[in-house]
Amino acid sequence: MPRKGPAPKRPVMVDPVYGSPLVSQLVSKILLDGKKTVAQNIVYTALEGCRAKNNTDPVQTLKRALDNIKPSLEVKSRRVGGATYQVPVEVKPARQTTLAMRWLVNFSRERREKTMAERLMNEILDASNGLGASVKRREDTHKMAEANRAFAHYRW
């Protein structure tokens, strides 16, 4: 561990088009090989598609989707006396958002639609309706935490 303590949290910049830090965070998660313009085009096209399909504010749709994906519990491995236990722990708000974004992007990449913008748009729309692979991932995480509830007293 560093002697100077943890690195300070940097503020997330707001997005120039939508004025939302969530959108700029999503752009950063989509980013590959430093091609930020490509990532921005993907996200903006996906959000415009959400607006066209739902006739609602795309940032609100994204927020609703992320709220449906955010996990409240997860399991962490803890070694006690030669045995490794999966200990359920609560997830901090910043990590909830990070995990939700990561799952949204990863499961978007696995979808079968033609372009990444289409995949992202459909995953956002599915998640905002409580469907999709990313919401299933959250449910699986919660089930795992519930199944290992007996080891909750090993929390640190």
Curated annotation (Swiss-Prot):
A Gene Ontology molecular function term of the record: structural constituent of ribosome
CDD domains associated with the record: uS7_Bacteria (cd14869)
Alphabetic keyword roster: Ribonucleoprotein, Ribosomal protein, RNA-binding, rRNA-binding, tRNA-binding
GO biological processes: translation
Presence of keyword Lipoprotein: no
SUPFAM superfamilies to which the protein is assigned, alphabetical: Ribosomal protein S7
GO cellular component, one term: small ribosomal subunit
Domain of life: Bacteria
Record's subunit section: Part of the 30S ribosomal subunit. Contacts proteins S9 and S11.
General function of this protein: One of the primary rRNA binding proteins, it binds directly to 16S rRNA where it nucleates assembly of the head domain of the 30S subunit. Is located at the subunit interface close to the decoding center, probably blocks exit of the E-site tRNA.
Similarity comment: Belongs to the universal ribosomal protein uS7 family.
Protein name stated in the entry: Small ribosomal subunit protein uS7
Organism (species): Cutibacterium acnes (strain DSM 16379 / KPA171202)
